[in-house]
């Protein structure tokens, strides 16, 4: 209700669905099923890298995790995520890289659902594409219950996911971002 969408839009893979419409759909889902931790994670578990379109293709073609992420970031506005991603690196030798997923532009009433869905979806998509970041930790804006469920989605111990942080960060050993991806194709990567 109130989305401006009808059944034809939902079956048309070329239909344009705007962010405000998606947020209204999320509000309707939450109103119907209840605002409970893990609802977004359940939805994110159905993600695949193929559903991200050309961005997923760029991720698969990238020779390393770093290059795949750096190629995909400028095009994320074309993807189903509402998180703003960036890759940052610590200065300590042998330290960590951080895939930052800012959520400050998402309306507060749907933010937890979207963060859950998109971070769990990323975990599912990476697992399906055999991309192992070997995360050591996740810092998240989510509450404790959601953080624990997010740990499960990424295959981490509960203690490795810190709740109620200022932003969302996937903590990756720095050397992992330069590991060659199993499906890397340099000829395809040159196209991007």
Label the model's feature ranges.
Residues 8, 103-104, 175-177:
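A broad detector of the eukaryotic-type serine/threonine protein kinase catalytic domain
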Residues 58, 112, 178-181:
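Short, surface-exposed loop/turn motifs that are enriched in glycine and acidic residues
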Residues 152-192:
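Extended mid-to-C-terminal alpha-helical interaction segments
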């Amino acid at each position: 209700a109130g989305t401006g969408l009808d059944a034809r839009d939902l079956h048309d893979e070329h239909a344009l669905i705007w962010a405000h419409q998606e947020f209204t759909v999320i509000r309707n889902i939450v109103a119907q099923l209840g605002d409970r931790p893990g609802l977004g994670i359940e939805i994110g578990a159905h993600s695949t890298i193929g559903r991200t379109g050309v961005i997923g293709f760029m991720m698969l073609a990238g020779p390393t995790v770093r290059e795949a992420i750096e190629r995909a970031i400028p095009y994320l506005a074309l993807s189903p995520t509402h998180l703003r991603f960036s890759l940052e690196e610590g200065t300590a030798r042998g330290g960590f890289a951080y895939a930052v997923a800012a959520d400050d532009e998402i309306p507060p009433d749907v933010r937890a659902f979207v963060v859950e869905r998109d971070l769990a979806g990323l975990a599912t998509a990476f697992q399906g594409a055999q991309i192992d970041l070997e995360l050591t930790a996740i810092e998240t804006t989510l509450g404790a219950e959601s953080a624990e469920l997010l740990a499960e989605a990424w295959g981490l111990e509960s203690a490795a996911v810190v709740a109620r942080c200022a932003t969302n960060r996937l903590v990756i050993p720095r050397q992992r971002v330069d590991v060659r991806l199993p499906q890397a194709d340099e000829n395809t990567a040159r196209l991007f």
